[in-house]
Amino acid sequence: MILSGHARLAGVIGYPVAHSRSPRLHGTWLERHGIDGAYLPLAIAPDDFAACVAALAKMGFAGANVTIPHKEAAFAVCDRVADSARRAGAVNTLVFTPTGIEGANTDGSGFLANLRAHGVNPAAGPALVLGAGGAARAIATALQDAGAVVTLCNRSPERAVALARDFGLVHIPWEARSAALADHALVVNTTSLGMAGHNPLELDLARAAPGMAVADIVYVPLETPLLAAARARGLVAVEGLGMLLHQAVPGFAAWFGVTPVVDDALYRAVAADLMG
Protein backbone atom coordinates (compact mmCIF):
# COMPACT_ATOMS: atom_id res chain seq x y z
CA MET A 1 0.00 0.00 0.00
CA ILE A 2 1.26 3.48 -0.90
CA LEU A 3 0.92 5.86 2.04
CA SER A 4 -0.56 9.33 1.68
CA GLY A 5 0.51 12.45 3.50
CA HIS A 6 -2.28 11.76 6.00
CA ALA A 7 -1.17 8.23 6.91
CA ARG A 8 -1.46 7.16 10.54
CA LEU A 9 1.79 5.80 11.97
CA ALA A 10 2.51 3.52 14.92
CA GLY A 11 5.14 0.93 15.80
CA VAL A 12 6.75 -1.31 18.36
CA ILE A 13 9.72 -0.05 20.39
CA GLY A 14 12.22 -2.60 21.65
CA TYR A 15 15.92 -3.43 21.78
CA PRO A 16 16.30 -5.67 19.92
CA VAL A 17 13.02 -5.65 18.00
CA ALA A 18 13.67 -7.63 14.81
CA HIS A 19 12.09 -10.75 16.38
CA SER A 20 8.75 -9.03 17.06
CA ARG A 21 5.68 -10.36 15.26
CA SER A 22 3.70 -7.20 16.02
CA PRO A 23 4.44 -5.63 12.59
CA ARG A 24 3.03 -8.74 10.89
CA LEU A 25 -0.01 -8.68 13.14
CA HIS A 26 -0.81 -4.99 12.76
CA GLY A 27 0.09 -5.06 9.08
CA THR A 28 -2.53 -7.76 8.52
CA TRP A 29 -5.18 -5.62 10.20
CA LEU A 30 -4.16 -2.52 8.23
CA GLU A 31 -4.52 -4.42 4.96
CA ARG A 32 -7.78 -6.04 6.01
CA HIS A 33 -9.38 -2.68 6.78
CA GLY A 34 -7.77 -0.73 3.95
CA ILE A 35 -6.32 1.79 6.38
CA ASP A 36 -3.93 4.49 5.21
CA GLY A 37 -1.26 3.73 7.79
CA ALA A 38 1.83 1.78 8.77
CA TYR A 39 3.19 -0.04 11.81
CA LEU A 40 6.98 -0.10 12.09
CA PRO A 41 9.62 -1.96 14.12
CA LEU A 42 11.64 0.64 16.04
CA ALA A 43 14.96 -0.52 17.54
CA ILE A 44 15.74 2.02 20.25
CA ALA A 45 18.51 1.61 22.84
CA PRO A 46 17.59 2.21 26.50
CA ASP A 47 19.61 5.43 26.78
CA ASP A 48 17.69 6.88 23.83
CA PHE A 49 14.22 5.73 24.81
CA ALA A 50 12.75 8.88 26.35
CA ALA A 51 14.13 11.21 23.67
CA CYS A 52 12.94 8.95 20.85
CA VAL A 53 9.43 8.61 22.28
CA ALA A 54 9.19 12.39 22.50
CA ALA A 55 10.42 12.65 18.91
CA LEU A 56 7.85 10.12 17.67
CA ALA A 57 5.07 12.13 19.30
CA LYS A 58 6.32 15.34 17.68
CA MET A 59 6.60 13.59 14.30
CA GLY A 60 2.91 12.78 14.37
CA PHE A 61 2.95 9.11 15.33
CA ALA A 62 -0.33 7.94 16.86
CA GLY A 63 1.46 5.81 19.43
CA ALA A 64 3.50 2.67 19.94
CA ASN A 65 3.75 -0.68 21.63
CA VAL A 66 6.61 -1.06 24.09
CA THR A 67 8.46 -4.32 24.62
CA ILE A 68 11.62 -5.53 26.37
CA PRO A 69 13.59 -3.78 27.82
CA HIS A 70 11.48 -0.61 27.93
CA LYS A 71 8.22 -1.52 29.69
CA GLU A 72 9.23 -0.05 33.05
CA ALA A 73 10.97 2.99 31.53
CA ALA A 74 7.77 3.76 29.63
CA PHE A 75 6.17 4.83 32.90
CA ALA A 76 8.43 7.85 33.11
CA VAL A 77 7.45 9.22 29.70
CA CYS A 78 3.70 9.05 30.34
CA ASP A 79 1.62 12.03 31.38
CA ARG A 80 -1.24 9.70 32.33
CA VAL A 81 -1.08 6.01 33.23
CA ALA A 82 -4.08 3.67 33.23
CA ASP A 83 -4.83 1.56 36.28
CA SER A 84 -3.97 -1.55 34.24
CA ALA A 85 -0.40 -0.31 33.87
CA ARG A 86 -0.14 0.89 37.45
CA ARG A 87 -1.19 -2.49 38.81
CA ALA A 88 0.96 -4.42 36.34
CA GLY A 89 3.99 -2.27 37.07
CA ALA A 90 4.70 -1.84 33.36
CA VAL A 91 3.46 -0.03 30.24
CA ASN A 92 3.18 -1.84 26.91
CA THR A 93 0.97 0.58 24.97
CA LEU A 94 1.54 4.30 24.40
CA VAL A 95 -1.06 6.61 22.87
CA PHE A 96 0.04 10.09 21.81
CA THR A 97 -2.72 12.67 22.31
CA PRO A 98 -2.86 16.47 22.00
CA THR A 99 -2.74 16.68 25.80
CA GLY A 100 0.11 14.25 26.40
CA ILE A 101 1.19 10.63 26.36
CA GLU A 102 -1.14 7.98 27.77
CA GLY A 103 0.18 4.61 28.93
CA ALA A 104 -1.64 1.32 29.44
CA ASN A 105 -0.89 -2.36 29.91
CA THR A 106 -2.97 -4.74 27.80
CA ASP A 107 -1.30 -8.02 28.80
CA GLY A 108 -3.90 -8.84 31.44
CA SER A 109 -6.93 -8.02 29.30
CA GLY A 110 -5.35 -9.86 26.37
CA PHE A 111 -4.83 -12.94 28.51
CA LEU A 112 -8.44 -12.91 29.72
CA ALA A 113 -9.76 -12.45 26.18
CA ASN A 114 -7.70 -15.43 25.05
CA LEU A 115 -9.05 -17.55 27.90
CA ARG A 116 -12.62 -16.67 26.98
CA ALA A 117 -11.94 -17.41 23.30
CA HIS A 118 -11.10 -20.95 24.44
CA GLY A 119 -14.33 -21.21 26.42
CA VAL A 120 -12.64 -20.73 29.79
CA ASN A 121 -14.33 -18.61 32.45
CA PRO A 122 -11.53 -16.88 34.41
CA ALA A 123 -13.74 -16.78 37.50
CA ALA A 124 -14.67 -20.49 37.35
CA GLY A 125 -12.30 -21.37 40.16
CA PRO A 126 -8.92 -20.70 41.78
CA ALA A 127 -5.98 -19.92 39.47
CA LEU A 128 -2.34 -20.94 39.94
CA VAL A 129 0.10 -18.51 38.31
CA LEU A 130 3.67 -19.74 37.81
CA GLY A 131 6.19 -16.89 37.74
CA ALA A 132 6.43 -13.44 39.31
CA GLY A 133 7.70 -11.15 36.55
CA GLY A 134 5.89 -8.40 34.68
CA ALA A 135 3.61 -10.77 32.77
CA ALA A 136 2.73 -12.67 35.94
CA ARG A 137 1.87 -9.41 37.67
CA ALA A 138 -0.42 -8.29 34.83
CA ILE A 139 -2.12 -11.69 34.54
CA ALA A 140 -2.49 -12.27 38.28
CA THR A 141 -4.11 -8.88 38.86
CA ALA A 142 -6.39 -9.30 35.82
CA LEU A 143 -7.53 -12.70 37.10
CA GLN A 144 -8.08 -11.21 40.54
CA ASP A 145 -10.17 -8.39 39.05
CA ALA A 146 -12.18 -10.98 37.09
CA GLY A 147 -13.12 -12.72 40.33
CA ALA A 148 -10.58 -15.54 40.61
CA VAL A 149 -8.69 -16.44 43.78
CA VAL A 150 -5.05 -16.36 42.68
CA THR A 151 -2.11 -18.38 43.99
CA LEU A 152 1.45 -17.42 43.03
CA CYS A 153 4.37 -19.81 42.68
CA ASN A 154 7.87 -18.79 41.56
CA ARG A 155 11.33 -20.34 41.45
CA SER A 156 12.73 -17.37 43.38
CA PRO A 157 10.29 -16.90 46.26
CA GLU A 158 11.20 -13.30 47.11
CA ARG A 159 9.45 -11.79 44.06
CA ALA A 160 6.35 -13.94 44.50
CA VAL A 161 6.14 -13.08 48.20
CA ALA A 162 6.38 -9.35 47.39
CA LEU A 163 3.74 -9.59 44.66
CA ALA A 164 1.44 -11.62 46.89
CA ARG A 165 1.82 -9.05 49.65
CA ASP A 166 1.11 -6.12 47.30
CA PHE A 167 -2.20 -7.53 46.04
CA GLY A 168 -3.40 -9.84 48.78
CA LEU A 169 -2.64 -13.05 46.88
CA VAL A 170 -1.68 -16.51 48.13
CA HIS A 171 1.91 -17.73 47.71
CA ILE A 172 3.21 -21.30 47.74
CA PRO A 173 6.76 -22.70 47.33
CA TRP A 174 7.93 -23.76 43.86
CA GLU A 175 8.25 -27.35 45.04
CA ALA A 176 4.51 -27.44 45.82
CA ARG A 177 3.35 -26.50 42.31
CA SER A 178 2.31 -29.99 41.15
CA ALA A 179 0.56 -30.87 44.40
CA ALA A 180 -1.43 -27.62 44.17
CA LEU A 181 -2.95 -28.50 40.79
CA ALA A 182 -5.78 -30.51 42.34
CA ASP A 183 -7.06 -27.38 44.10
CA HIS A 184 -7.09 -25.09 41.05
CA ALA A 185 -9.26 -24.73 37.93
CA LEU A 186 -6.55 -22.94 35.95
CA VAL A 187 -2.76 -23.01 35.83
CA VAL A 188 -0.79 -20.38 33.91
CA ASN A 189 2.88 -20.56 32.96
CA THR A 190 4.33 -17.05 32.73
CA THR A 191 7.97 -18.19 33.01
CA SER A 192 10.42 -18.79 30.16
CA LEU A 193 10.38 -22.54 30.87
CA GLY A 194 9.23 -24.35 27.74
CA MET A 195 10.33 -21.57 25.41
CA ALA A 196 12.55 -22.57 22.49
CA GLY A 197 16.12 -22.89 23.81
CA HIS A 198 15.01 -23.17 27.46
CA ASN A 199 14.37 -26.12 29.74
CA PRO A 200 10.80 -27.44 29.80
CA LEU A 201 8.50 -26.71 32.71
CA GLU A 202 8.32 -29.72 35.01
CA LEU A 203 4.70 -30.01 36.11
CA ASP A 204 2.90 -33.26 36.93
CA LEU A 205 -0.44 -32.86 35.16
CA ALA A 206 -1.51 -36.28 36.42
CA ARG A 207 -2.37 -34.38 39.59
CA ALA A 208 -4.55 -31.84 37.78
CA ALA A 209 -8.23 -31.52 38.56
CA PRO A 210 -10.54 -32.90 35.83
CA GLY A 211 -11.39 -30.23 33.27
CA MET A 212 -8.53 -27.97 34.34
CA ALA A 213 -7.44 -25.26 31.90
CA VAL A 214 -3.70 -25.08 31.23
CA ALA A 215 -2.42 -21.80 29.79
CA ASP A 216 1.09 -20.99 28.57
CA ILE A 217 2.02 -17.46 27.49
CA VAL A 218 5.05 -18.82 25.59
CA TYR A 219 4.33 -18.82 21.84
CA VAL A 220 7.67 -20.02 20.45
CA PRO A 221 7.10 -22.89 19.99
CA LEU A 222 3.36 -22.60 19.39
CA GLU A 223 2.83 -25.96 21.10
CA THR A 224 4.99 -26.05 24.22
CA PRO A 225 5.68 -29.34 26.04
CA LEU A 226 3.25 -28.18 28.74
CA LEU A 227 0.41 -27.66 26.25
CA ALA A 228 1.14 -30.95 24.50
CA ALA A 229 0.95 -32.76 27.84
CA ALA A 230 -2.31 -30.98 28.68
CA ARG A 231 -3.92 -32.00 25.38
CA ALA A 232 -2.75 -35.58 25.87
CA ARG A 233 -4.65 -35.69 29.16
CA GLY A 234 -7.80 -34.13 27.73
CA LEU A 235 -7.32 -30.83 29.56
CA VAL A 236 -8.12 -27.45 28.02
CA ALA A 237 -4.91 -26.06 26.46
CA VAL A 238 -4.66 -22.29 25.96
CA GLU A 239 -1.70 -21.26 23.80
CA GLY A 240 0.30 -18.05 24.12
CA LEU A 241 -0.10 -16.73 20.58
CA GLY A 242 -3.75 -15.93 21.23
CA MET A 243 -2.76 -13.65 24.10
CA LEU A 244 -0.34 -11.81 21.81
CA LEU A 245 -3.13 -11.23 19.30
CA HIS A 246 -5.78 -10.15 21.81
CA GLN A 247 -3.49 -7.78 23.73
CA ALA A 248 -2.85 -5.88 20.49
CA VAL A 249 -6.51 -4.96 19.91
CA PRO A 250 -6.81 -1.89 22.22
CA GLY A 251 -3.69 -0.21 20.83
CA PHE A 252 -4.72 -0.70 17.21
CA ALA A 253 -8.17 0.70 17.98
CA ALA A 254 -6.68 3.78 19.66
CA TRP A 255 -4.17 4.49 16.87
CA PHE A 256 -6.16 3.66 13.76
CA GLY A 257 -9.78 4.19 14.81
CA VAL A 258 -10.96 0.64 14.05
CA THR A 259 -11.46 -2.18 16.55
CA PRO A 260 -9.98 -5.25 14.82
CA VAL A 261 -11.11 -8.84 15.17
CA VAL A 262 -8.95 -11.76 16.28
CA ASP A 263 -9.99 -14.71 14.12
CA ASP A 264 -8.63 -17.96 12.69
CA ALA A 265 -7.28 -16.24 9.57
CA LEU A 266 -5.23 -13.82 11.66
CA TYR A 267 -3.98 -16.64 13.88
CA ARG A 268 -2.85 -18.66 10.86
CA ALA A 269 -1.10 -15.66 9.29
CA VAL A 270 0.93 -14.84 12.40
CA ALA A 271 1.59 -18.52 13.17
CA ALA A 272 2.94 -19.01 9.65
CA ASP A 273 5.22 -16.01 10.15
CA LEU A 274 6.49 -17.52 13.41
CA MET A 275 7.30 -20.80 11.73
CA GLY A 276 9.21 -18.99 8.98
Curated annotation (Swiss-Prot):
NADP(+) binds at D83, G131, A132, G133, G134, A135, I217, G240. The active site is at K71. CDD domains: NAD_bind_Shikimate_DH (cd01065). GO terms for cellular component: cytosol. The keyword Amino-acid biosynthesis applies. Pathway: Metabolic intermediate biosynthesis; chorismate biosynthesis; chorismate from D-erythrose 4-phosphate and phosphoenolpyruvate: step 4/7. GO terms for biological process: amino acid biosynthetic process; aromatic amino acid family biosynthetic process; chorismate biosynthetic process; shikimate metabolic process. It catalyses: shikimate + NADP(+) = 3-dehydroshikimate + NADPH + H(+). Its EC number is 1.1.1.25. It comes from the Bacteria. InterPro entries: Aminoacid_DH-like_N_sf, NAD(P)-bd_dom_sf, Shikimate_DH, Shikimate_DH-bd_N, Shikimate_DH_fam, Shikm_DH/Glu-tRNA_Rdtase. Shikimate binds at S20, R21, S22, T67, N92, D107, Y219. Keywords: Amino-acid biosynthesis, Aromatic amino acid biosynthesis, NADP, Oxidoreductase. One of its GO terms (molecular function) is shikimate 3-dehydrogenase (NADP+) activity. The keyword NADP applies. Homodimer. Belongs to the shikimate dehydrogenase family. Involved in the biosynthesis of the chorismate, which leads to the biosynthesis of aromatic amino acids. Catalyzes the reversible NADPH linked reduction of 3-dehydroshikimate (DHSA) to yield shikimate (SA). PANTHER family: BIFUNCTIONAL 3-DEHYDROQUINATE DEHYDRATASE_SHIKIMATE DEHYDROGENASE, CHLOROPLASTIC, SHIKIMATE DEHYDROGENASE. This is Shikimate dehydrogenase (NADP(+)).
